[in-house]
């Protein structure tokens, strides 16, 4: 069973929980709820995966890459319009979900796509795109907040519509 390391921190915007690999790849990012709730959700999400979650504070040895990723993620949450080079590792998702998430990563900051546009591009239905967005476990880095309803309508967001609206506004998108 491989170890993954998690950390919880506050930004100017919200509380964030990150799970990272030894080499600093973000494999889980959750935000917006109190730390105790974020930890509970994380434990449930990882319950069927073959990883042992450990607090980052218990890690010994070189944490340089992890620390860099954490700092970059803090900056990204506070200023999502400024691109950060943060590597991710997908531990969750079906092949279809991962295909959708790879398309989401191509949407630049400051732009949105509708569920229908993505569905047409991938040859599926809008509802499927919505379900894939809802299954995303890496907030902000897999930018499901950039997917909106028809007529640019603000729709649901796993971490709360208020955070979706905040992220879009910070990227210069008025919804």
Curated annotation (Swiss-Prot):
<dbReference type="GO" id="GO:0032259">
    <property type="term" value="P:methylation"/>
</dbReference>
<dbReference type="InterPro" id="IPR014048">
    <property type="entry name" value="MethylDNA_cys_MeTrfase_DNA-bd"/>
</dbReference>
<feature type="binding site">
    <location>
        <position position="127"/>
    </location>
    <ligand>
        <name>DNA</name>
    </ligand>
</feature>
<dbReference type="GO" id="GO:0006307">
    <property type="term" value="P:DNA alkylation repair"/>
</dbReference>
<keyword id="KW-0227">DNA damage</keyword>
<dbReference type="Pfam" id="PF01035">
    <property type="entry name" value="DNA_binding_1"/>
</dbReference>
<keyword id="KW-0539">Nucleus</keyword>
<comment type="function">
    <text>Involved in the cellular defense against the biological effects of O6-methylguanine (O6-MeG) and O4-methylthymine (O4-MeT) in DNA. Repairs the methylated nucleobase in DNA by stoichiometrically transferring the methyl group to a cysteine residue in the enzyme. This is a suicide reaction: the enzyme is irreversibly inactivated.</text>
</comment>
<keyword id="KW-0234">DNA repair</keyword>
<dbReference type="InterPro" id="IPR036217">
    <property type="entry name" value="MethylDNA_cys_MeTrfase_DNAb"/>
</dbReference>
<keyword id="KW-0489">Methyltransferase</keyword>
<feature type="active site" description="Nucleophile; methyl group acceptor">
    <location>
        <position position="144"/>
    </location>
</feature>
<dbReference type="GO" id="GO:0005634">
    <property type="term" value="C:nucleus"/>
</dbReference>
<dbReference type="InterPro" id="IPR001497">
    <property type="entry name" value="MethylDNA_cys_MeTrfase_AS"/>
</dbReference>
<keyword id="KW-0238">DNA-binding</keyword>
<feature type="binding site">
    <location>
        <position position="115"/>
    </location>
    <ligand>
        <name>DNA</name>
    </ligand>
</feature>
<comment type="similarity">
    <text>Belongs to the MGMT family.</text>
</comment>
<keyword id="KW-0808">Transferase</keyword>
<dbReference type="InterPro" id="IPR036388">
    <property type="entry name" value="WH-like_DNA-bd_sf"/>
</dbReference>
<dbReference type="GO" id="GO:0003677">
    <property type="term" value="F:DNA binding"/>
</dbReference>
<protein>
    <recommendedName>
        <fullName>Methylated-DNA--protein-cysteine methyltransferase</fullName>
        <ecNumber>2.1.1.63</ecNumber>
    </recommendedName>
</protein>
<dbReference type="GO" id="GO:0003908">
    <property type="term" value="F:methylated-DNA-[protein]-cysteine S-methyltransferase activity"/>
</dbReference>
């Amino acid at each position: 069973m491989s170890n993954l390391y998690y950390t919880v921190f506050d930004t100017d915007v919200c509380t964030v929980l990150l799970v990272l690999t030894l080499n600093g790849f973000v494999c889980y990012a959750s935000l917006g709820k109190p730390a105790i709730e974020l930890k509970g959700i994380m434990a449930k999400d990882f319950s069927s995966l073959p990883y042992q979650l450990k607090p980052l504070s218990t890690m010994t040895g070189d944490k340089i890459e992890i620390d860099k990723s954490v700092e970059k993620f803090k900056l990204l949450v506070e200023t999502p319009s400024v691109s950060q080079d943060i590597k991710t590792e997908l531990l969750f998702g079906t092949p279809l979900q991962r295909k959708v998430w790879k398309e989401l990563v191509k949407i630049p900051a400051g732009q949105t796509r509708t569920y229908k546009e993505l569905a047409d591009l991938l040859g599926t239905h809008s509802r499927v795109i919505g379900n894939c967005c809802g299954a995303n476990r890496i907030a902000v880095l897999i930018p499901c907040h950039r997917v909106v309803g028809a007529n640019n309508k603000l729709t649901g967001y796993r971490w709360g519509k208020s955070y979706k609206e905040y992220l879009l506004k910070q990227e210069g998108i008025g919804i």
